[in-house]
Every structure is written in C-alpha cells, then in structure tokens.
C-alpha cells in the first residue's frame, strides 16, 4: 500500500491529487487546488510551500510526484513555473518524501494512452479510472494524472524487477 501525492505546479494555481495504491488498485483519496492570492511572486511561492506542507501533513503520503517544466514561449512564465515547482519540491523534501518527475507527455500517455491528449480527455479518464462521480477541476485532474502516472511507472518497473531511480526518473534525494 502506498499513498501518492501528485502535483501539477503553477505560480497562480497548483493542483494536487492524492491516491492510495492497494495492490493493482488506485483509490481516490482527495484533490484540489492551491490558489495563490498575492501579486508578489515570493508570497505566492510561500503560499504554495505552506499549502503543500499542510496537504502533506493531512494525507501523510509515502511518495511525491510532480510534472516537469515544459518549454514555454514566454520565458518569464517558464521561470515562474520553475520557481513554483521548486517551492513544491522543497515542501516534499522537507517532509523526507522521495520526489519523482514526469513530463506532460508521459503523464498523458499513462492516463489517456496518447501523449497528445487534451485536458478534457485527461479529466474524463481520471474520472473513469478513479471511479469519481464527476470530472475533477482541470488542475486537480492533472495532478491526479501525475499520481496515476507515477503508480503505473512503478508498477511497470516492479514487474521488470526495479523501481524508479534518480537518474532515469528525476528523483531528488
């Protein structure tokens, strides 16, 4: 049994999703969004750190997975996203959680079956996979997708006799 916290980072909205993995089953535990209220980036980063630290205390996850930074057309947006990821990763490492990173393509492939899936397709598949009464909000669905991707990656590696490691899957120690 493992509880996985998945995070879809953003400087304004950071989605989180928690699943409990029992054998080959993934059970929905909780999800939501941390919406930052300040216009000043340092205060938004603190809100992300504090919010995820509280979520970690509440759900007591065993593992933490986060979406990797993608290349953005706007360099300023990419930098802010990277800083939001940093705040999230520090919250995880402060709680001694192993951190794994996955690209958007890996996440979409694990959830939908194609790396070019639309957000609405991810929402629909997360609803189906986790047997939810309705589709979660987009950022929360993406975060649940990160957790599902991490579960499937570890299941595949376990079948081959291993687990995600720091070189291959971007874990921090």
From Swiss-Prot:
GO annotations of cellular component type: cytoplasm; Holliday junction resolvase complex
Active site residues per record: 8, 67, 139
Name assigned to this protein: Crossover junction endodeoxyribonuclease RuvC
Organism this protein belongs to: Shewanella piezotolerans (strain WP3 / JCM 13877)
S-S pairs: none
Binding positions for Mg(2+) 1 per the UniProt entry: 8, 139
Gene (UniProt): ruvC
InterPro entries, per the entry: RNaseH-like_sf, RNaseH_sf, X-over_junc_endoDNase_Mg_BS, X-over_junc_endoDNase_RuvC
Statement: the UniProt record of this protein carries the keyword DNA damage: yes
GO-annotated biological processes: DNA recombination; DNA repair
Residues noted as binding Mg(2+) 2 in the record, renumbered to the chain: 67
Subunit text: Homodimer which binds Holliday junction (HJ) DNA. The HJ becomes 2-fold symmetrical on binding to RuvC with unstacked arms; it has a different conformation from HJ DNA in complex with RuvA. In the full resolvosome a probable DNA-RuvA(4)-RuvB(12)-RuvC(2) complex forms which resolves the HJ.
Cofactor, how bound (note): Binds 2 Mg(2+) ion per subunit.
Gene Ontology terms for molecular function: crossover junction DNA endonuclease activity; DNA binding; magnesium ion binding
């Amino acid at each position: 049994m493992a509880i996985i916290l998945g995070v879809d980072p953003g400087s304004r909205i950071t989605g989180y999703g928690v699943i409990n993995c029992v054998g080959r089953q993934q059970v929905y535990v909780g999800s939501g969004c941390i919406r930052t209220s300040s216009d000043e980036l340092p205060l938004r980063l603190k809100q992300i750190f504090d919010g995820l630290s509280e979520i970690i205390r509440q759900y007591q996850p065993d593992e933490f997975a986060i979406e990797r930074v993608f290349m953005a057309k706007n360099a300023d947006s990419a930098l802010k996203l990277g800083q939001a990821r940093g705040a999230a990763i520090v919250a995880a490492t402060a709680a001694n959680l192993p951190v794994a990173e996955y690209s958007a393509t890996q996440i979409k492939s694990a959830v939908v079956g194609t790396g070019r899936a639309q957000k609405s397709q991810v929402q629909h598949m997360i609803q189906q996979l986790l047997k939810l009464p309705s589709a979660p909000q987009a950022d929360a669905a993406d975060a649940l997708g990160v957790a599902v991707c991490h579960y499937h990656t570890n299941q595949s590696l376990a079948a081959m006799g291993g687990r995600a490691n720091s070189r291959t899957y971007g874990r921090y120690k």
